[in-house]
A protein has these predicted regions:
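C-terminal auxiliary extensions adjacent to catalytic cores
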Residues: 21-47, 51-58, 62-70, 179-507
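Short, surface-exposed recognition loops or helix-turn segments adjacent to catalytic cores
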Residues: 157-167, 245-247, 326
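Glycine-rich, flexible loop motifs
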Residues: 22-37, 43-73, 100-158, 217, ...
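FAD-binding core of FAD-dependent oxidoreductases
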Residues: 77-91, 95-99, 106-129, 159-181, ...
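Catalytic or ion-translocation cores adjacent to nucleophile or general acid/base/metal-coordination motifs
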Residues: 93-108, 365-377
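Alpha-helix capping at helix-to-loop junctions
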Residues: 128-132, 148-155, 164, 182, ...
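Polyanion/phosphate-binding surface patch
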Residues: 74, 89, 261
Length: 507
């Protein structure tokens, strides 16, 4: 499946469509080729999952290597030793199974509200895929059971808090493993008994934070595209100029995502009667930055999302447990450390906060009679008697403020744990929670902007906006009628927000 940041701007000259959806294909796990789009398909659309037969052979080979090392009497972390600060404690072979069982039971100590179902499904999928790399030393029955659970819709309750993301997401993955051994809150067809190394191989990894990151990156790209439609509609509503989106300007500063943003805006704003109505004799020389600099700002947002996508896409197929099996060797390392994903999530949070702030400023220009080039105050039919979008703009301002507070990076908030053995930790799950909250806020801000922009266009009739903007306006009107008198707007905002998440307005 195509990665999300690719092909954002149509390469053809056809019309932009809003809400086009493609049917996901079944996903086969081989530990090498899982994509973000695959994660979304399985996590949210219940696409079936299978295991690659050749990759299963590699899984079996790595298991034989672990068993051979045990027979040779080699000391292996987490196989015949304690964990973390207790790694110096040697564990007799006859207690190997109990060691793995104790690990799962003790580490299943997460707290807080449960993760949503799509996040749990993403985590399950990613954990199975990592095991399929053949470097974890587990039996094939582990990924096989995970896939059976996914395909049958068996999802354990996984608390959302309690992971610092250092030895991976120990608590969330332990709650998943608890179900697999028959001690969780969901019944599995055939609970397994964990053999040497298998408990550690299962819980040592970044799959909780990476699953959340994959879903967030997908949603962030959808919002990025939607924000361009909202920007185009706002520009039309206040009779702004598309001239600053001329390709020559952006080729002179060739940041790739700035160029793509400008190209998308040019396509959105082509053939506008509204533009032609004020092309000549307009006393305004230049629009405000929130209109004129949209490609520069959203282009930078796109660069941040592309960076995050690259890190997340790599992590989907990365071996993140410890120790790892390479041929006949079992090596200890630190691939479980979640810093790459925590950093990616912090970048997403900052990028989406920037997007949200820009959207709120455009919204202000549409509703403010001093800035809107002739639209009625707050888009009300009878300003004064009616308040129109006054409080909707205040709601957007409140959401922006919350985004800015939450944009403080989590990946620098290290708190040493486990007797100072884990002395540098990335806080990836905290970064994921913050980024998710910012995403939800930003979606609502763009929803309010879409509603206001659509209302603004009502006052410019019979002039017609650009064809793509007209289609977007019609799509918004399917969810929310024009404001003819004051009414509560909460339901309208939430409906449009839901459609944004579904990709209904993504150009």
């Amino acid at each position: 499946m195509q990665e999300l940041g690719a092909g954002v701007v149509n390469s053809h000259s056809g019309a932009l469509a809003f809400g086009a959806m493609t049917k996901p294909s079944p996903v086969t796990l081989d530990g090498q080729s899982l994509s973000i789009a695959d994660v979304v398909a399985v996590a949210r659309h219940n696409v079936s999952v299978a295991l690659d037969p050749q990759a299963l052979k590699a899984v079996q080979q790595s298991r034989r290597a672990v068993e051979a090392a045990i027979e040779r009497g080699e000391t292996m972390y987490g196989v015949n030793t304690g964990f973390g600060k207790l790694a110096h404690v040697r564990i007799p072979a006859e207690q190997g199974r109990q060691l793995q069982l104790n690990l799962i039971r003790s580490h299943a100590s997460g707290v807080g509200e449960p993760l949503p179902q799509d996040a749990v499904r993403a985590m399950m999928l990613l954990r199975a895929n990592v095991l399929m790399r053949g470097t974890s030393g587990v039996r094939p029955v582990l990924p096989e059971l995970l896939i059976e659970m996914l395909n049958r819709g068996l999802h354990p309750r996984v608390p959302s808090q309690g992971s610092v993301g250092a030895s991976g997401d120990l608590a969330p993955l332990s709650h998943l493993a608890l179900a697999m051994i028959g001690e969780g809150d969901v019944r599995v067809p055939k609970p397994i008994t964990l053999e040497a190394k298998e408990g550690l191989a299962f819980v040592n990894g970044t799959q909780a934070q990476t699953g959340l990151a994959a879903l967030l990156v997908s949603d962030a790209w959808t919002l990025w595209r939607t924000a361009h439609g909202a920007a185009a509609m706002s520009l039309e509503a206040v009779r702004g100029s598309p001239d600053p989106f001329d390709a020559r300007i952006h080729d002179a500063r060739p940041h790739p995502w700035q160029q793509r943003s400008a190209a998308l805006l040019r396509e959105l704003l082509a053939d506008s009667e509204i533009r032609e109505s004020h092309r000549d004799n307009d006393p305004r020389v230049q629009d405000a930055y929130s209109l004129r600099c949209t490609p520069q700002v959203l282009g930078a947002v796109g660069e941040g999302l592309a960076f995050a996508e690259r890190l997340v896409a790599t992590e989907l197929n990365a071996a993140t447990d410890n120790p790892l099996v390479f041929g006949d060797e079992v090596l200890s390392g630190g691939n479980f450390h979640g810093q790459p994903i925590a950093l990616a999530l912090d970048v997403v949070a900052i990028a989406l906060t920037t997007l949200a702030g820009l959207g709120e400023r455009r919204l202000e220009r549409v509703v403010n009679p001093d800035l809107s080039s002739g639209l009625p105050a707050f888009l009300a039919r009878e300003p004064g008697l009616e308040s129109g979008f006054m409080i909707a703009q205040i709601a957007a301002a409140a959401l922006v403020a919350e985004c800015r507070v939450l944009a403080t990076p989590a990946s620098v908030q290290s708190v040493p744990t486990e007797g100072n053995q884990e002395d540098v930790v990335p806080m990836g799950m905290t970064a994921a929670w913050k980024a998710g909250r910012i995403l939800a806020n930003a979606e609502r801000i763009i929803a309010i902007e879409l509603l206001a922009g659509a209302q603004g266009l009502e006052y410019l009739k019979p002039l017609r906006p650009a064809k793509a903007v007209a289609r977007l306006h019609a799509a918004v009107r399917q969810e929310s009628a024009a404001l003819t008198a004051d009414r509560p707007l909460t339901a309208d905002i939430e409906r449009v927000t839901l459609r944004i998440r579904e990709g209904r307005f993504a150009s």
